[in-house]
Amino acid sequence: MTTESNPSFTSEPNASLQTGVDHWSALLQNSESELAKAQAEIDAIAYDLYGLEGDDRAAIEAMLQSSDAEADDGDADGQDENLTSADPAKLTSELLDYCVGVAFGRWDIRYATGEKAAPPEPDPFEALPLCAPGMLQNAEGLPAKPNEVDAGYPIRISWEGILVDDSTHEEDLYKRVLEALTLMWGEQAGSIEQEACDFLGVRSLRDYFAEKKAGGRYFKEHLSRFSKSRRKAPLYWPISTESGTYTLWLYYPRLSTNTLYSAVTQFIEPKQTEVQENFAKLNAKQARTKAEDKELEHAHLLVAELATLRESLLEIAQFWKPDLNDGVQITAAPLWKHFRLKPWQKTLKDTWGKLENGNFDWAHLAHSIWPKRVIQKCIDDRSLAIAHGHDEALWAETTDATGKSKWQTRQNAEAIAEELISQQTV
């Protein structure tokens, strides 16, 4: 259970975060108690079905207890699997992640404020829902679009899918999170914010969200939250300047071919103008204070870094056609140098290298960047042709002398491939 999809942690708007932590701990304890009770009932049924009693039953129970102890000792992560208490810092991090999702329109904040009743528990034998519980949905149960949200929805949604760490911008990540906290806690939002800082051990929430040269804490925790085994799939991407002093946050499910262009025209270029004007103003002063000298140095660095970021994103935008079917790592790979968290940057850099080498030519992104290489491969690999929708153009089903059907490339497949390549490179 996490607060990311279950707003129970925030279901009492007038309560403190500590009250929420205590409430969540009680839920965990109750869940463990119910699980233990159910397990005991299952064990009793199994013993009865197999006619196990006395010494046989005692031997099995001793063996199970021994296995459990060995599993605990051999836990590779060294983590306690007993979830009878809640971690305040972890829950606070999940709450803030929830608020970011609210700003992007991922989560329906009305569940957290109590305006809407919590979704019913699903039947275990029902088909999996299209959306996670608590998501902002349309009438068909799909993620809501701008024209599918009630006019009276209580908070503004950043439909463009871009937020920014910039106190002067209306899409400032910190301010959008604070809007969500204010909607949930009203006049108590200030004390809730301070309590969150205390739990997280940070001076301010802006510091918590900020990306540094080597990455920031929020994204590190977000990445961990959306990682399982070897699969890493963060939803909120920090795209930063080299020093991390300016960061755009992209919402993965809403990426499009226009995203990077929007990032440049709506965020980076206005910021460039602002910083350049401030730099010129400070530089023109005859006598500056130490604070102004420091501000001038910062502005000089930011002018250069924003120009580099703008140029890089426009270059990537020319070939970047994100397709969610490719998955997070492949989609994010071209942007690897703009992530500051080193382990994630390395993962994406390695992925980009494999994309360049043709290891992932099944991906839509590979097809859009290297159409000649990928389409030529489709002549020899029908599964690849199917993946890119070229199977009917390049392959035909034939019948041999024995009447057995088989697939083979069309006689004019090379010419067709050249035509397909020319269409992709126009």
Can you describe what each PLM-predicted range is?
Residues Y50:
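Active-site-proximal loop/hinge segments that shape catalytic or ion-binding/gating pockets
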